[in-house]
Amino acid sequence: MASVDRRRTPLLTPRFALIVGSGFAYFLALGTVLPAVPQYVKHRLGGGDVSVGVAVGVLFVGAVLLRPYVGRLGDRFGRRVLIVSGATVVAVSVLLYGAVESLPFLIGARILTGLGEAAFFVGAATMVTDLAPVERRGEAISYWSVAVYGGLAFGPVLGETVIDARGYGAVWVVAGALAALAAVLGFFTREVERPVAVSVPGRGHLLNRAAIGPGAVLFSGLIALAAFTAFVPLYVDDIGLGSADVVFLLYGGLVLVVRIFGARIPDTLGGRRSGVLALASTTIGMTVMALWGTTAGLLVGTVFFAAGASLLYPALLLLALGNAPETERGSVVGTFSSFFDLSQGLGSLIVGLVAAGGGYRGAFGAGAVFAAAGFVGLAVHASRRRSRRVRTEELGVLATEHPAP
């Protein structure tokens, strides 16, 4: 009966819409600079493919180092302070991108963006799970990820449009304004009453162990995203498409469709099965892009890739949250999302090196290989969970057979 009551608890409330709206403005800001940074490095600063990979990926270096800390802070002091401070730091740092036409200066500003990104994402994503009934948590994560991937998908279209009309300086201003809007919306959010954390021996680790396995799979699967966002804006010139607008519009539209109409998929199939579907679709999409070097190949590959990217994050986060106490949600999100940062930071460097030696299609192929490797990670994670379950059941039997005096 309790389960029925929780399921009837409304999810799409004004409070939920406010935090998702803040997230969309924020990720639209990040998405706006996605096509601008590679082109700015290559055409204005004279950098090569490795420099592009570093400039794109270094944002996530600061984020990956900070996320576990801010996850613990969010569990102790609340989510709103992370949301507001993170978005504010991002707004200021993006405005600095064009202050000095220097690659080292840009890299420094990108690291600062990463620090703000870590705080905002952990605060907002954790508040989303705070607001959701347990049985609808996968659905809530899916709606939240509409904001994440919708912003990252449609932001590049806005960025390309602004570059064509007003140049790089205008892109930094537009992105900074969107991040500032996210901070304002975040200011009007309210904290959710949460279970009180109880100190348990062995649970004071910086990295939350429940999130490490699913996070490692996320890392492997999302290196494809690093290849897609870094090199599609440059690859379109090679195949005569001219602009990446249509590719990012296709990607964004499909992400929205899957996330909205397939929001219950992770809850229905479970995190592991949904993760398998996501990895399979991602692998197929990146393989098509790598082997079919035409406009049609890029568009067909994008369809499969978008479907996979839509499901991967909510499926694996649901898996991670199911392994941890309710009092550790912030810590789980912080640790889990660190692997997202790692995939985009280290992943951008990896695909940048591959692109320097094997071209942009080689970078897409690397994304396919890493996504396929995610199946191994899921299998290992499932095996370990079964082993722990068996050991727990055996201990329970022993305790029953030999009760304490």
Task: Briefly describe each language-model feature range.
Residues V81-L95, G176, R273-V288:
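Structural signature of the two symmetry-related core transmembrane helices
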Residues S93, P104-L112, A296-F304:
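Paired small-residue
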Residues F60-P68, L152-A153, V255-I260, Q344-G345:
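Residue-level signature of mid-helix packing/kink "hotspots" within the transmembrane helices
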